[in-house]
């Protein structure tokens, strides 16, 4: 396990606390911005204006909340993982572990929170064609789902390697009426799918809305996706008060692009007593070079329209990322995560494929919940975290997705070990 904890010379986060909105031009400190072809600037401005107007429109928020409840199944429960807590209990006690059950959402992950919100925005803007990128397939499934619900044309770009790993989700998208476009360029994974989706958008910007699936990309996407996912943290905040009478000590979530983590973290950013911990994919090990630990090992650069930390070689070229988890297999990260790391407000670490598999099995056997491989990375961090916490600490983990989609991958990895 690899960690990037705040150092002694890190600025006091309270003095640099981000506001509810990014700074001018979509900046989070030095990160973010809009590094896109001129063709897309009007579309980004239109999207930012539409979102600002929508949040002020009670008809929009009422409809969004109605569908989140009746269609998505919110609010998702905050579940006390009693046996998992007991597993990490020491002789002098230990933390109590709670799961924010985003895996119980319609489509099986947090992704539908954002897909639903952006689909409603697309309808407001009169856009009838929707495109999306997907890695693990969950964002693609969520986008295909809301497009079916609203009668919108849907094209999902997915790397050919990810299509192989996530064949079940490919079939689900097609069953929902979406066109799934295989991307064979580069590593045939999420980065390449995102690049193809952006190319499509440049060509068809007048008729098409791009439902970007993470807190990455050009402004206003990092803000927009974060705000639609903030329902996770807003619910968790109230549920913690109901369940144990106060805010949690630690929030824990996996980080690829970082949408599920930001959705949980954002409503707590001002509460400096709450530790925010994101867990990346160390793949075969950070030292091997085959990983997706962007915050742990990355340097500042520009990818997919935003400045953030990226995995780069010595010449500044974006490196290939690797993770057993298709949803974390990305060489970049959302700009707000990079900023929270810089100011010391959030901590980030990385766990290997093997550590994630071990955690997936542990949670499955102890709690009867099979988490997604992405989510399993957050669970794996408990091995490092729990021994360091005082007795009575409260941990909330974002259980961001269920593991049905990953059963074949896990079976290939474990072979005859089960």
UniProtKB/Swiss-Prot annotation:
Molecular function GO terms recorded:
tryptophan synthase activity
Question: Mind telling me which Gene3D superfamilies this protein's record contains?
Answer: 3.40.50.1100
Which pairs of Cys residues are joined through disulfide bonds in the record? none
Alphabetized UniProt keyword annotations: Amino-acid biosynthesis, Aromatic amino acid biosynthesis, Lyase, Pyridoxal phosphate, Tryptophan biosynthesis
Catalytic reactions on record: (1S,2R)-1-C-(indol-3-yl)glycerol 3-phosphate + L-serine = D-glyceraldehyde 3-phosphate + L-tryptophan + H2O
Single GO cellular component term: cytoplasm
Q: What is its EC number?
A: 4.2.1.20
InterPro entries given for it?
Trp_synth_b_CS (IPR006653), Trp_synth_beta (IPR006654), Trp_synth_beta/beta-like (IPR023026), TrpB-like_PALP (IPR001926), TrpB-like_PALP_sf (IPR036052)
Q: In which pathway does it act?
A: Amino-acid biosynthesis; L-tryptophan biosynthesis; L-tryptophan from chorismate: step 5/5
Tell me the segments the record calls region Disordered. 1-21
> Which residues are modified to N6-(pyridoxal phosphate)lysine?
111
List cofactor names only.
pyridoxal 5'-phosphate
| Positions with biased composition (Polar residues) | 1-12
Subunit note: Tetramer of two alpha and two beta chains.
Q: State the protein's purpose.
A: The beta subunit is responsible for the synthesis of L-tryptophan from indole and L-serine.
For this chain, the family text in UniProt reads: Belongs to the TrpB family.
The name on file for this protein is Tryptophan synthase beta chain
Record gene name: trpB
């Amino acid at each position: 396990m690899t960690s990037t904890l705040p150092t002694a010379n890190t600025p006091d986060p309270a003095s640099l606390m981000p506001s509810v909105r990014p700074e001018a031009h979509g900046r989070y400190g030095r990160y973010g911005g809009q590094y896109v072809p001129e063709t897309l600037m009007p579309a980004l401005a239109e999207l930012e204006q539409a979102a600002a107007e929508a949040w002020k429109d009670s008809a929009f928020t009422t409809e969004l909340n109605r569908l989140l409840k009746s269609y998505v199944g919110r609010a998702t429960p905050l579940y006390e993982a009693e046996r998992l807590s007991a597993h990490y209990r020491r002789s002098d006690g230990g933390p109590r572990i709670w799961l924010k059950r985003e895996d119980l959402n319609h489509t099986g992950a947090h992704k539908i929170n954002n897909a639903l919100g952006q689909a409603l925005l697309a309808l407001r803007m009169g856009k009838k064609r929707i495109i999306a990128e997907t890695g693990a397939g969950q964002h693609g499934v969520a986008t295909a789902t809301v497009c079916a619900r609203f009668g919108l044309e849907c094209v999902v770009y997915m790397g050919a390697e990810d299509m192989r790993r996530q064949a079940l989700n490919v079939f689900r998208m097609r069953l929902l009426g979406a066109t799934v476009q295989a991307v064979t360029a580069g590593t045939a994974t999420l980065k390449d799918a995102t690049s193809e989706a952006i190319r499509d958008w440049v060509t068809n910007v007048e008729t098409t809305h791009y439902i970007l699936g993470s807190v990455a990309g050009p402004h206003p996407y990092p803000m927009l996706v974060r705000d639609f996912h903030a329902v996770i943290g807003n619910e968790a905040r109230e549920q913690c008060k109901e369940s144990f009478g106060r805010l949690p000590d630690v929030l824990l979530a996996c980080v690829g692009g970082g949408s599920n983590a930001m959705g949980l973290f954002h409503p707590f950013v001002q509460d400096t007593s709450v530790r925010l911990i994101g867990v990346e994919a160390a793949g075969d090990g950070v030292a091997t070079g085959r990983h997706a630990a962007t915050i742990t090992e990355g340097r500042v650069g520009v990818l997919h329209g935003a400045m953030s930390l990226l995995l780069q070689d010595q010449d500044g070229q974006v490196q290939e990322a690797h993770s057993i988890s298709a949803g974390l297999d990305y060489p970049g990260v959302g700009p707000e995560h990079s900023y929270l790391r810089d100011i010391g407000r959030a901590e980030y670490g990385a766990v290997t494929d093997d550590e994630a598999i071990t955690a997936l099995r542990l949670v499955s056997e102890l709690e009867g919940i099979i988490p997604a491989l992405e989510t399993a990375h957050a669970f794996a961090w408990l091995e490092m975290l729990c021994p360091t916490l005082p007795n009575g600490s409260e941990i909330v983990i974002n259980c961001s997705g269920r593991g049905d989609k990953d059963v074949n991958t896990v079976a290939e990895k474990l072979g005859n070990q089960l």
